[in-house]
Amino acid sequence: MNVQNLSSEAMIPKGVKDFLPVNAVKIHYIQEQLHRTFKAWGYQTIIPPALEFLNVLERGLGSDLHSCTQRFDDRHSGELLAFPPDITPQVARIFATRMHEAPLPQRLSYTGRVLRHTEQQAGKNREIFQSGVEMIGNPSPSADAEMIAMALECLEELNAPEYTIDIGQVEFYRGVLQGLSLNPQQKRTIEQHLLHKDSSSLKAEMETLNISSTQADELLALPRLFGGREVLEHADGVVTNERSKRALDNLHEVIRILELYQADARITLDLGELRGLDYYSGVTFQGFLSGFGEAVCLGGRYDDLTANYGRPTPATGFAFNLLNLLFSMSDILEEAAQPGVDILVNATEKHDSIAYKLAHQLRKEDKSVCTRFGTEPDAHELRKFHCRTLINISTDGEKVTLFSPKTKQTRQSTVSALLSASVDL
């Protein structure tokens, strides 16, 4: 590869990005805000490794993630290694194999980057930034409600624009399918129609199947079972099988607890949601921001996952896609997370010791500070530095001028006053 003739984009693999300060500071801000909320709810941070043995990792992956796992040979062990496409299976492995003495439930949080193979023409990101939580050891609806309430609080703390959490329950669909004699192809066809909420195609498919009118009515109702809380009452009048009835009872209890959290105003229900059928075991949910087509967070209950690592324990969790948050909240983050420094201290080289001393003091006051030596920078140069305040030390080494590039206001002060922290910056 002759890098001399390559554009900056062509120098890195497709599906990954360089993040320059203007966006890197926003990603860091999102991470900090999320982990502040995670910590407030009592979740402890863990850091999984960047690599896993493929045969170990695959035990905890759903079918959709098997095909997008990046793998390669390990020259040391001769085993196949993999870059994890999701962090939750790693958390399950760590809990099951490393945390035998830990009390239950365990509340764990994480931030990391995962890699997923995508088709070249799809144009999707192969590298995904995740921040999430897992609660392991609580089988009750209160744990599911805690996940949803915390996800809502995270979005609120980020000052996200209009947002909703869409809640599903995979056991409801499994109950509808239970007792039907369908081959794998028929199941896939039905699920595709449900995925696209294509009622007419679903009805046409029903006419080809040998099922009762009651079973057909249950299936045909699925695309319409989305909306507010009234969906539960509607569904209760449609389904007759016990498995689906239990799923509805579970959802009633989750929503009752969300009301206690005062977190029920921004939720919707979708009982035709089939995401992660081979992975999730109960309540599932997705977070959406108005005007952005992809989910910014995904979560749900996965009671069978830790058993794949030798320790069956009920669990639930969710993860935010940080890049989806970045792209969907760009305007809001522009104000909340700006690159640059708080203060630029400028002086002649004759007064470098004063500039260094002043910068040191200001950093102790939790300011970000850069020093510069030479003539006072002009407006164009200040914009390049992205500084909030310019402190220009005069030639006498004592008087200073404070200038705000944003407000264009100028103030006079002294080095002594700044060193004594008596000037509001």
Question: Which residues are covered by each model-predicted region?
Answer:
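Charged, compositionally biased N-terminal leader segments and the immediate start
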Residues: M1-M11, L177, L182-T189
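Positively charged, Gly/Ser-enriched RNA/tRNA-binding surfaces
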Residues: N2, Y29-W41, E52-F53, T88-E101, ...
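Short, conserved phosphate-binding/catalytic loop or strand-edge motifs used
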Residues: N125-S131, I167-G175
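TRNA-binding/sensing appendages of the translation machinery
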Residues: M1-P89, A145, D166
